[in-house]
Amino acid sequence: MSANGWFQILLFLGLILAVTKPLGVFMARVFNRERTFLDPVLRPIERLIYRCTAVDESQEMKWTEYAIAMLLFSAVSMLMLYIMQRVQLHLPFNPQKFGAVDPAHLAFNTAASFTTNTNWQAYSGEAVMSYFTQMAGLAYHNFMSAAVGIAIAIAFIRGIARRQSETIGNFWVDMTRAVLWVLLPFCIMGALALVSQGVVQNLKPYDTVKLVEPQQVTTTGADGKSSTQTITTQTIAQGPVASQEIIKEWGTNGGGFFNANSSHPYENPTPLSNLIEMFSIFAISAGLTYTLGRMTGSQRHGWAVWGAMAALFLVGVSVVYWAEASGNPLLAGVDQHTSAMQAGGNMEGKEVRFGIANTALFATITTDASCGAINGWHDSFTPLGGMVPLVNIMLSEVIFGGVGAGMYGMLIYIVLAVFIAGLMVGRTPEYLGKKIEAYDVKMAMLVALIFPLIILVFSAISSVKTFGTGSILNPGPHGLSEILYAFVSGTGNNGSAFGGLTVNTPWYDVAIGIAMLGGRFLMIIPMLAIAGNLAKKKYVPASAGTFPVTTPLFSVLLIGTIIIIGALTFFPALSLGPILEHLQMHAGKAF
């Protein structure tokens, strides 16, 4: 570890702190239908969209209507993406003449992935997807799935803020305003910033260039005979990368235009582009904590939530940085000390232009949020370094979290935290003037149980059946970690992976696809039910026995609730995976 590395980590957190209030105020004004500086340009576009789609922007919805609208929109969007992949060969902007995405289970997996904001990729983007599919299919879903998440979070906040109301907003209006005001303007500026750093943006066919030094490759055929081939050229992929890269991060989507994701120099060429991408992942989620405080009338509560998130983030990034900077004890003959000429530590799977500090920071950010973008290979981290991204997702990605998803996930933990506080003082728990009753706790626990149930059931099946174990590259505890990470990432709508697992198989494509859909929609519905129930309730003035939700004590209780419910649920599985691998690594055994 180095002072420069810590400075970069603290600089990043300082930037997020600086943007929290202005962005939070802006989003509160947008969703409260207050005037903003963008209204003269965007209001006419918004009204035109409503006229074309026959949406009455003054008509609000009950939580059930809100949920149905969200489910129908997502289902139609997913079907459209599936069809687009299957007829890709006949669509424009396909200079490489890529055929239909095949087999069908891969197209299903990809459609489920981008619809749910997961962006899990069981394919190599530059070898499978045409420019049209990337732009009209995947990038479109990057915008819309992020907008759905923001809409759900805003609906939940309205449920807390409103009194004796049957409605929580209009899904179509919330989603439209999320796209027009929150996502598009910032993505336009961000894409231009990335282009200035060297991220490509074109519709050119792939380039073929001659290698400076020809390479010889020896392969073994099915008959057992080996043959040597001399490679003299290389194909360099092109494409509209910058426009997709920025919404990939700003919308916490994570799916890369290229298979190497944000470690590819065409996606993330410089340290400055790396900072822009990391900042984009956390910005909206941090701002939503201030939006929560502003819309509910308790700004200090918003900061208390921000503080809990920041504390968990700092612990996570510190552990990853320490684990990776410490290096691998099995490589005693390799110089792993930090110096002016090298980053030191475990550099396997990391880009030298970023080093260990920025790779550890990026990995923590992308798994704290439901993003899944990577600038280094998580599978090549040390056991403890790789465990932190895994645990971050297991906590339901509430450490700032995905756009919208992090906020409504955190609100579930808040409901459970104030319920626990109420039990300790022997009175009905209250949250910002609303009594938390049995129905609310049941729905919150339903969310808390669905997540680990999906993960552990699918992981258990994959660990004992040959169609699951046959995809493992590394045996032993690391193989279990690869399986566990796949289903944690899918169910948590993250999308990152331990790349040693071969996932483009019928079992993993279908199982992870189902996990992604369940992790998104089976959790959103109970959340909306809580929002609808809270909106109906009367305001109860705070009394001497009310547990304050604006203090450091509340932040500590919230952190404890997250760790107990989130992390301890998976502790047995972690003990058999990364923890066991760490102990065996220090005993001299590798996998």
Curated annotation (Swiss-Prot):
List, in alphabetical order, the Gene Ontology terms for molecular function in this entry: P-type potassium transmembrane transporter activity; potassium ion binding
Question: What residue intervals traverse the membrane?
Answer: 6-26, 63-83, 137-157, 179-199, 272-292, 303-323, 405-425, 444-464, 510-530, 553-573
Location comes to: Cell inner membrane
Q: Name one Pfam family in it.
A: KdpA
Record carries keyword Thylakoid: no
User: How does this protein lie in the membrane?
Assistant: Multi-pass membrane protein
Q: Does the keyword 4Fe-4S apply?
A: no
Primary location class: membrane
Q: Which InterPro entries match?
A: KdpA
Quote a single Gene Ontology cellular component term.
plasma membrane
Q: Which UniProt keywords apply?
A: Cell inner membrane, Cell membrane, Ion transport, Membrane, Potassium, Potassium transport, Transmembrane, Transmembrane helix, Transport
Q: How does it assemble?
A: The system is composed of three essential subunits: KdpA, KdpB and KdpC.
Instruction: Please state which protein family the record places this protein in.
Output: Belongs to the KdpA family.
User: Tell me, what does this protein do in biology?
Assistant: Part of the high-affinity ATP-driven potassium transport (or Kdp) system, which catalyzes the hydrolysis of ATP coupled with the electrogenic transport of potassium into the cytoplasm. This subunit binds the periplasmic potassium ions and delivers the ions to the membrane domain of KdpB through an intramembrane tunnel.
Name used for this protein in its record: Potassium-transporting ATPase potassium-binding subunit
Q: Organism classification, top ranks?
A: Bacteria, Pseudomonadati, Acidobacteriota, Terriglobia, Terriglobales
Q: Which gene encodes it?
A: kdpA
